[in-house]
């Protein structure tokens, strides 16, 4: 048995302008090669574009998009008796948000467009409306979990 204590779970800090943890999570996820100022720049430009497109609070659009993309359940590969089964498992809120942010950024990177701020803003607006690649990814994950429901007892 380990003598070390359990590590305290870190809480995400909030960003300087919107004072929001989700924005900070998004910034940390979009970050490449340690260029955090560029990541902030991209996010804030995307927020401005959302403000112009929808004429609503960009934070509420972001929250709605993440709420729409967050999965409730996912599948995990589990090896049982020589064969690998996709076992459906429930996802906690923190992990669900992290997955949602990852899917939103992945979908926006695949989008055709001028720059990342434009692509991200378009994807967030689409996700808030209930369409877009990230929403499709969530639905696909839920379908996979539903199809493999028979293996739920392997948890």
Swiss-Prot record:
Listed Gene3D superfamilies: Ribosomal protein S7 domain (1.10.455.10)
UniProt keywords, alphabetically: Chloroplast, Plastid, Ribonucleoprotein, Ribosomal protein, RNA-binding, rRNA-binding
Top-level taxon in the UniProt lineage: Eukaryota
Chief place of localization: plastid
A cellular component term, taken from the record's GO annotations: chloroplast
SUPFAM superfamilies for the chain: Ribosomal protein S7 (SSF47973)
Record-linked InterPro entries: Ribosomal_uS7, Ribosomal_uS7_bac/org-type, Ribosomal_uS7_CS, Ribosomal_uS7_dom, Ribosomal_uS7_dom_sf
Pfam families: Ribosomal_S7
Compartment(s) where it occurs, according to its Swiss-Prot or TrEMBL record: Plastid, Chloroplast
Function noted in UniProt: One of the primary rRNA binding proteins, it binds directly to 16S rRNA where it nucleates assembly of the head domain of the 30S subunit.
Record's subunit section: Part of the 30S ribosomal subunit.
Protein's name according to its UniProt entry: Small ribosomal subunit protein uS7cz/uS7cy
Annotated organism of origin: Glycine max (Soybean)
Lineage, highest ranks first: Eukaryota, Viridiplantae, Streptophyta, Embryophyta, Tracheophyta
Originating gene: rps7-A
């Amino acid at each position: 048995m380990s003598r070390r204590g359990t590590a305290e779970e870190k809480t995400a800090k909030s960003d300087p302008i919107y004072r929001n943890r989700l924005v900070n999570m998004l910034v940390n996820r979009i970050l490449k090669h340690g260029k955090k100022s560029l990541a902030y720049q991209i996010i804030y430009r995307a927020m401005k574009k959302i403000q112009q497109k929808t004429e609503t609070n960009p934070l509420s659009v972001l929250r709605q998009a993440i709420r729409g993309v967050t999965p409730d359940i996912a599948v995990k590969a589990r090896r049982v008796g020589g064969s690998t089964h996709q076992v459906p498992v429930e996802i906690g809120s923190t992990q669900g948000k992290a997955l949602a942010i990852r899917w939103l950024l992945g979908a926006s990177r695949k989008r055709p467009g001028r720059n990342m701020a434009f692509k991200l803003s378009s994807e967030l607006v689409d996700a808030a409306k209930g369409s877009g690649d990230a929403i499709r990814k969530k639905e696909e994950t839920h379908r996979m979990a539903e199809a493999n429901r028979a293996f739920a007892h392997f948890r």
